[in-house]
Every structure is written in structure tokens, then in C-alpha cells.
Amino acid sequence: MQNIRLISHPLIEHKLTILRDKNTDPFQFRMLIDEITYLMLFEASRDFELKDTEVITPVATTKSKKLAQKIMICPILRAALGMLGSVFKLLPDASVGFLGFQRDEKTLKAEFYYAKLPKDHAERIAIVIDPMFATGGTAIDAVRFLKEKGVKKIKFISILAAPEGLNRFSEVYPDVEVYTAAIDRGLNEKGYIIPGLGDAGDRVFNTVY
């Protein structure tokens, strides 16, 4: 799976340990999601193209660089909303394209129900964000939708991933890079990542019952 990028960093591993803990409260969980995403984005943006520009400092004019391409962040509703704030810290000019998928608990398949993209979406690099990469079904459907809409460059950022989902995704879209902070043991009979961290959406929005 040459398109899979496993990000290894001491800070990420430390924060991920606390994130997994069932006793981590919702406020701290949200903060950790934000911080881990922030750190991962440095690696995911490593190959962004730059263009020449000039900047006037208080004492002189100098040649410099700035991003050459427009960015579109595509959070998969709802859990990925917890990752969105950290993206804006690094890419404040990015546009947002929302993708809505609802998991069917019986079939374990994701049902597409909503999309809202910026008008110039086909001109932008799309960074799809979703904290959990389990069966790979949602990721495949999201990338298929974006490609059908004319988006040419797509990256995927997910905090945790299962090997089953990564293998399935790579067979369909070997051209799309997936960045993850951990590849866990696998999936259980309900399609949840093991050992994982539970339902990320429920823990972000404090709807665990």
C-alpha cells in the first residue's frame, strides 16, 4: 500500500494514548482531536506547491514564497467537525466542502445524504478529514463523489485506521494518499476499529449513552 502514510511522532503517540482512554472526558477528547489533526497536517501538506512572491517588511522588500494552490477541506459529517478547527489554524483561507454520510448499523455501509462544495471545487486540492478509517466504505464513496465532481488532487487524513479498510481503499484508489496516526489491529463484528477509541462522533459531541 504505497499510498498509505503512517505518521510517527512522539507527541502524536502521546496524545493518541490519552485519546483512546475511555476515561478521557469530552472536553479533553475534543482538544486532543484538534491537536493531533494539527500535527498531522504538517506531514499531509509537505508536498504543497509554492509560488514566488514579494513581501514588504518594515525595513525592505524581499522575495518569498506562498502556497500556489487553493485548498478545500472536506469533513465527513459529523465526527470530522472536531478536526476542522485545527485545519483553519494552519489554512485559514481554505474553503470547506461538507460531505454527509450516515452509517447503517445493520449493513455497516455508509449512506450518502448531503454535500455542499464551493463553486470552484474542481480547482482546489481536496483534503478529506475523518477521525476513523474503518471499513473504507465511506472513504471510497467520498473520493468517488469528489472525482465525479472534477476534483483532481485528493488527500485523506484519518487519526485511526483499520488494515481492512486501508487495503480495500488502496485497491480502488491507489492514487489517493491516506495519512493516519495509527493502524490498529482490525475490525470487530460490528465494524468498529479494535482497539480503537470508541465512536469518535459520540465522544466529540458527548452523546455517549
From Swiss-Prot:
Regulation: Allosterically activated by GTP.
An individual GO BP term: uracil salvage
Binding site for uracil: I193, G198, D199, A200
EC number, as in UniProt: 2.4.2.9
UniProt cross-references to InterPro entries, sorted A to Z: PRibTrfase_dom, PRTase-like, Upp_B, UPRTase/APRTase, Ura_phspho_trans
EC top class, as a word: transferase
Residues reported to bind 5-phospho-alpha-D-ribose 1-diphosphate: R78, R103, D130, P131, M132, F133, A134, T135, G136, G137, T138, D199
Cofactor dependency: Mg(2+)
CDD domains the UniProt entry points to: PRTases_typeI
Pathway entry: Pyrimidine metabolism; UMP biosynthesis via salvage pathway; UMP from uracil: step 1/1
Listed GO MF terms: GTP binding; magnesium ion binding; uracil phosphoribosyltransferase activity
Manner of cofactor binding, per the entry note: Binds 1 Mg(2+) ion per subunit. The magnesium is bound as Mg-PRPP.
Keyword field: Allosteric enzyme, Glycosyltransferase, GTP-binding, Magnesium, Nucleotide-binding, Transferase
Highest taxon of the lineage: Bacteria
Catalytic reactions on record: UMP + diphosphate = 5-phospho-alpha-D-ribose 1-diphosphate + uracil
Function: Catalyzes the conversion of uracil and 5-phospho-alpha-D-ribose 1-diphosphate (PRPP) to UMP and diphosphate.
Protein family per UniProt: Belongs to the UPRTase family.
Record protein name field: Uracil phosphoribosyltransferase
Species of the source: Campylobacter fetus subsp. fetus (strain 82-40)
Organism lineage string: Bacteria, Pseudomonadati, Campylobacterota, Epsilonproteobacteria, Campylobacterales
